[in-house]
Amino acid sequence: MADRQHFPSAITEAVSSNTACPDTGPKAETTNIFLLLQRNITIESSKHVFSSIVEYILILTLMFAFSAILYVIYKSYISPVFYKKELTEVGFDHIPQGPDKGRRISRAQASRRMGSKLPPPYPNGWFAVAETRELKVGSVLSIDALGQNLCVYRGEDGLARCVDAYCPHLGANLAVGGTVRGSCIECPFHKWRFNAAGTCVSLPGSDIAPKGVSIRTWCVVETDGAIWIWHDAEGREPLWEITDPPELKDFGYRGRNEFEVSAHIQEIPENGADVPHLNAVHSSSLLSDLGERYPVLHEIIGRHVWNADWTKSDDHTSLMHITQEYKVLKYDLARIDVKVTQIGPGHVRLFLKTSVGPFYIAQSVTPLGPLLQKVIHRVYSPAYNAPVGAFLVRCEAYMFERDVTIWNSKRFVSAPAYVKTDKTIRTFRNWFGQFYSEHSLSFRDALQNPLDW
């Protein structure tokens, strides 16, 4: 057996252990060697396959993590978050699914009792009609809001302007096919041109513009990422000005959420003065609604605990301070301090202080119809917490949806059954009344002539 010295020791020992067996011939020895080689090869192959699988999983994990990081960077710094819900997407889960759900929702809305003595639907104030980022130089937008058809355009000088949509010549819609010429808007029908003051300054085939031909213009301000126009039923110049908050100089835009709400405009900001609703509607965790469905899990999953106070000023603003704590069992895991400033009927600014830095939210409420509001929240933050700011766009939207669900099916109650805790609601309604005036279009007239007054 001199040749055994050439085999690995494991094989040599195995072969030696077989010497006691009756079959000790060369054939049996060869078979044992083959089986041991096969077993070693199988083990080595299994190890190789296992290591390959682990390596493959690790590569996939790293690729996923890298892609996730790139996505977060992209949505935080390059392409802001945009979260939008149409009117029919929130608050209608009680209507069965099916191809006719849209019709059922329309029927439910039409049969809803709206209440009596509703305030005028279009109060006086500044209202956002377009997003700054969507109105490029030379572009034109068709806007229907405040019972008006509007043409919003950005001149070649970079300034945004707003005029009535219809040309005084033969009624063509300037926002549909109209062209920007310098600071002017040109009618698509006969090429009549109107300057920034609304005056017709030129038309083809004539060296002299017609006298006394003009189109209505609207006062415009750009701030908080939107284009705002001044609406006043008495035709007065703006009663107050709005400017950029100083914080925006160091903050970047992280995105916005947008909702259509079936309610009177007054009910949206009234929510702030309704302090008790915060813990009634917004205590359930954003992470899961299991605590709402199974109260025994409420403390384990966590809940939001709210404290707030609302005060009015002597002018067009009101102020609210909110503290929100997220509690799991008896432990406070996070706290947010919010300063809320209401500026007129359709503009709110929220400054948030958190453990991960400050944030700024600009809310606009714009009446698209007597009982249809467009509500937008634009979120800003410093660069270092941009990913959290992008996440906040959705978190704030999820909270706001809880209110929208209620608004989309409630009625307006002009004389509520007030209790002691509703004191701020009564005060709010008195304060908000300053935005209605003698010639404010009544709710009934707005329904009869929704886009012409």
UniProtKB/Swiss-Prot annotation:
Catalyzes the production of 7-dehydrocholesterol (7-DHC or cholesta-5,7-dien-3beta-ol) by inserting a double bond (desaturating) at the C7-C8 single bond of cholesterol. Essential regulator of steroid biosynthesis as this reaction is the first step in the synthesis of the steroid hormone Delta(7)-dafachronic acid. SUPFAM superfamilies: Bet v1-like, ISP domain. GO terms for molecular function: 2 iron, 2 sulfur cluster binding; cholesterol 7-desaturase (NAD(P)H) activity; metal ion binding. Pathway: Steroid hormone biosynthesis; dafachronic acid biosynthesis. This is Cholesterol 7-desaturase nvd. [2Fe-2S] cluster binds at C167, H169, C187, H190. One of its GO terms (cellular component) is cytoplasm. Belongs to the cholesterol 7-desaturase family. Residues 126-229 form the Rieske domain. InterPro entries: Cholesterol_7-desaturase, KshA-like_C, Rieske_2Fe-2S, Rieske_2Fe-2S_sf. Gene3D superfamilies: Naphthalene 1,2-dioxygenase Alpha Subunit, Chain A, domain 1, Rieske [2Fe-2S] iron-sulphur domain. Pfam families: KshA_C, Rieske. Its EC number is 1.14.19.21. It is a single-pass membrane protein. Keywords: 2Fe-2S, Cholesterol metabolism, Iron, Iron-sulfur, Lipid metabolism, Membrane, Metal-binding, Oxidoreductase, Steroid metabolism, Sterol metabolism, Transmembrane, Transmembrane helix. Its main location: membrane. Binds 1 [2Fe-2S] cluster per subunit. Its cofactor is [2Fe-2S] cluster. PANTHER family: CHOLESTEROL 7-DESATURASE NVD, IRON-SULFUR DOMAIN CONTAINING PROTEIN. It catalyses: cholesterol + NADPH + O2 + H(+) = 7-dehydrocholesterol + NADP(+) + 2 H2O; cholesterol + NADH + O2 + H(+) = 7-dehydrocholesterol + NAD(+) + 2 H2O. GO terms for biological process: cholesterol metabolic process. The chain crosses the membrane at residues 53-73. It is found in: Membrane.
